[in-house]
């Protein structure tokens, strides 16, 4: 990984899941790192797990706070002097159908999942443009390709990330900054367990969602991170992670108005007890 090994990478949401796996693989490849997460304990665990003789800085950060992201970018540049890769990975989930969640719930998720990405690009782009080669990776989701029941806020945020990233790629085409949008399929992380329960969603929604998530997550965070870094080295504009994501992408293209009929049974069927 020639590009990655010679650079300075910023990874948000690095306290667990894909973000932690990315930090570990980047450090092992020789990349300097600035890792951030709102979870201070998780961030410390990630930092302690990193291997490699590389410069590392840790930053407790709420990506929904614009002023905090601006200060974060300034701090990273002051410490590392340059940035070549930014991975906007931080994200949260919300359980409940649209009528079961409050507008405050909806805004909370959008502020993290969408505006956190926008802020990350806005305040790191100037330093990225100063490098001979640089890369922005924005993490969307397979739910930025299709829109399942019970994911109104999450899908809205991930479709927004997808659209924003595609526009950004077109606007930066021909420059030194390449842009990739990542669409992970089912990844084994703690996002479902940590999801916020909608204001009016029944308590059983969490148990059902976690059981469904466990059944539909064939890919590991480590596999996801490796695929993302492969896509960065290859300068891929769209990075689909997992066979499930590739299948859903094809299905949506073939049946854009009726794909949910094909997906609903698989996604919504109850977990079978042994």
Residue ranges of predicted features:
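Substrate-binding pocket helix/loop in short-chain dehydrogenase/reductase
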Residues: 97-98, 102-107
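Conserved glycine-rich cofactor-binding loop
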Residues: 8, 15-16
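Active-site loop immediately N-terminal to the catalytic Tyr-X3-Lys motif
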Residues: 99, 146-153
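The beta1-alpha1 cofactor-binding region of Rossmann-like NAD(H)/NADP(H)-dependent oxidoreductases
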Residues: 40-41, 60-71, 103
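SDR active-site lid
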Residues: 174-243
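Active-site helix of classical SDR
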Residues: 121, 157
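Residue(s) in the substrate-gating loop at a strand-loop-helix junction
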Residues: 141
């Amino acid at each position: 990984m020639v590009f990655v090994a010679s650079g300075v990478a910023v990874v948000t949401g690095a306290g667990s899941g894909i973000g932690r796996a990315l930090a570990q693989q980047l450090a092992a490849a020789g990349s300097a790192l600035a890792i951030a997460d709102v979870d201070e304990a998780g961030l410390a665990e990630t930092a302690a797990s990193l291997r490699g003789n590389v410069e590392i800085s840790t930053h407790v950060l709420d990506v929904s706070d614009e002023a905090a992201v601006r200060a974060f970018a300034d701090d990273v540049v002051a410490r590392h002097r340059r940035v070549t890769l930014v991975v906007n990975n931080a994200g949260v989930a919300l359980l409940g159908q649209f009528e079961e969640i409050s507008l405050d719930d909806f805004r909370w998720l959008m502020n993290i999942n969408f505006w956190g990405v926008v802020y990350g690009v806005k305040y790191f782009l100037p330093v990225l443009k100063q490098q001979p080669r640089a890369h922005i990776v924005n993490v969307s989701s397979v739910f930025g390709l299709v829109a399942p029941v019970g994911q109104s806020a999450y899908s809205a945020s991930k479709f927004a990330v997808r659209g924003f990233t595609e526009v950004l790629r077109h606007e930066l085409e021909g420059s030194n900054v390449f842009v990739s949008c990542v669409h992970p399929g089912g990844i084994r992380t703690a996002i479902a367990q940590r999801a916020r329960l909608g204001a009016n969603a029944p308590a059983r929604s969490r148990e059902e969602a976690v059981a469904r998530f466990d059944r539909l997550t064939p890919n590991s965070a480590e596999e996801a991170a490796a695929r993302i870094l492969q896509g960065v080295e290859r300068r891929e504009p769209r990075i689909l992670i997992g066979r499930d994501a590739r299948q859903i992408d094809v299905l949506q293209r073939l049946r854009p108005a009726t794909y949910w009929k094909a997906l609903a049974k698989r996604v919504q069927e109850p977990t079978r007890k042994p």
